[in-house]
């Protein structure tokens, strides 16, 4: 499509007038962000020659995203995640540093007041699934163990649901614990399974319209904090999960985070002597390396 010089001048004049409206902003960072957003937004509108009908549809879509969002469901997080915006923001704010563990998306299902457990305890709290023994260390990039690092963990059950998705307000499949004096940690959880993100709302409709899967690869969430260290938000994924080939709906997978969950035959002795009955169980190891807080 050829755009006349006169039309281009009209469009460019509007951009300049909108940019000038931010000149009196006293916050330099806010001014930078708003001007950059304006340039890119107007470039997008002009690039695709957006119709008024399409723009009104987009406004209605965002309105629906807001309406379905509540204290248990954050549709805007899902939108950010499925467009890759969450992962891009993580990438620019978590620059690779030596061998520090890579970060990935936070997700919408974190809860602040997860129960405290001790090393060796079970975070499932009645959630159903294959038991999994998870162990590892927390160290700095020089190889020194980090004692007393706070480790938040959360995951779905075998039906692909988090506790907050149930109506009974249960607390299951989540907890926090601390690394011991040697920087070691271990706990029982569940072997992660793939699950669809909530797709009965506008974000799900978007994914369906463009032919994308709403399914997340099987994963276990971690958030690890320690004094003077960069906070780590990450997952571990399950080697051999078929969804890895299809793709993660929020682009969260990194090769370094794919771990073996080695299935143990029923009756195999557990590391801590726990009786898991006549079912199989799995074990995995995730050694965590935290970057310095000033990088």
From Swiss-Prot:
The entry's keywords: Dioxygenase, Iron, Metal-binding, Oxidoreductase
GO molecular function, one term: ferric iron binding
Protein EC: 1.13.11.37
SUPFAM superfamilies: Aromatic compound dioxygenase (SSF49482)
Pfam families: Dioxygenase_C, Dioxygenase_N
Record's cofactor remark: Binds 1 Fe(3+) ion per subunit.
Binding site for Fe cation: 162, 195, 219, 221
GO BP: catechol-containing compound metabolic process
Protein name (Swiss-Prot/TrEMBL): Hydroxyquinol 1,2-dioxygenase
């Amino acid at each position: 499509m050829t755009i006349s010089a006169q039309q281009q001048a009209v469009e460019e004049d509007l951009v300049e007038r909108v940019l000038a409206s931010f000149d009196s902003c006293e916050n330099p960072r806010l001014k930078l962000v708003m001007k950059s957003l304006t340039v890119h937004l107007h470039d997008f509108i002009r690039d695709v020659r957006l119709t008024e009908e399409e723009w009104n549809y987009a406004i209605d879509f965002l309105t629906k995203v807001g309406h379905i969002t509540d204290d248990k469901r954050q549709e805007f997080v899902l939108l950010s995640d499925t467009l890759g915006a969450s992962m891009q923001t993580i990438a620019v704010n978590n620059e690779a540093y030596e061998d520090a563990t890579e970060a990935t998306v936070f997700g919408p299902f974190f809860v602040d007041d997860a129960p405290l457990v001790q090393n060796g305890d079970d975070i499932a709290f009645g959630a159903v699934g294959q038991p999994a023994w998870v162990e590892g260390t927390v160290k700095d990039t020089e190889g020194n163990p980090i004692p007393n690092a706070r480790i938040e963990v959360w995951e779905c059950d075998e039906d692909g649901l988090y506790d907050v998705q149930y109506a009974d307000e249960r607390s299951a499949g989540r907890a926090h614990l601390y690394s011991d004096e040697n920087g070691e940690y271990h706990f029982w959880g569940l072997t992660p399974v793939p699950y669809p993100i909530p797709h009965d709302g506008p974000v799900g409709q978007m994914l369906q319209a463009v032919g994308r899967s709403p399914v997340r690869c099987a994963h276990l969430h971690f958030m690890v904090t320690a004094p003077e260290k960069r906070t780590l938000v990450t997952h571990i994924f399950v080697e051999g999960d078929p969804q890895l080939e299809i793709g993660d709906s929020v682009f969260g997978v990194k090769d370094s985070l794919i771990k073996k969950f080695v299935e143990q035959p029923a009756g195999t002795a557990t590391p801590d002597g726990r009786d898991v009955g006549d079912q199989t169980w799995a074990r995995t190891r995730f050694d965590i390396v935290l970057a310095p807080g000033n990088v």
